[in-house]
Amino acid sequence: MNLEYGPEYEDFRAEVIDFCKEYEGISFENTSNKNISRSEWQKILIEKGFIARAIPKEYGGFGGETDIIKSRIIATEFSKAKIPGGMGGQGIDMLVPTLLEWGTEEQKQQYIEPTLHGEMIWCQGYSEPNAGSDLASLQTKGELKDGNWVINGQKIWTSTAQYSQMMFCLVRTEPQAPKHSGISFILIPMDTPGIELSLIHISEPTRLHLI
């Protein structure tokens, strides 16, 4: 079995190494002549195809093919050069793939690009006071009234809630269905009337919230 990368991948590795040399010493702090904002850095990485590689251009990605070997080369060379990667977080890592697979075209157009570029921050509304890893036990309920969802319940252990503009949330919308069914994935603006945040006091600097 030949585990060596072919010429195409070695050419790509050379491209990544040259990029890392160009941005050696990059900083997000105002202490370097190579200071750059995180949003600017995110844009550069997307344009080069070093992140969001397989996300279509019409949604703010690079528009390339999925290639696990190139992804490994990028991660390896960035690590060697101590070059920061792109933004992560629950929006980019969890919501964007979900929307690409299951979202409507309107949702894809509205949410994916600003999320990829760090302009829209998301938190995750899964765990509840009585439903942690067993999400089939969740009790937050959603009822459709006059074309809008009315949601009542609590979510807990929610990180980044204080910074987030949006939350993707699991809600029981069919209360008569079996416990593993009747659950909907709903996108909720965090400035929706009725949403309240309560800080859960744990060791700093971690901040989690009850919603």
Residue ranges and their predicted role:
Residues 200-211:
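Single conserved hydrophobic/aromatic residue that forms the stacking wall/gate
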Residues 111, 138, 156, 198-199:
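Short beta-alpha junctions and helix-cap segments that line functional grooves
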Residues 130-138:
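Active-site-adjacent elements of ketosynthase-type condensing enzymes
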Residues 140-143:
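A structural signal for short hydrophobic beta-strand segments in well-ordered beta-sheet cores
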Residues 148, 152-196:
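A short core secondary-structure module
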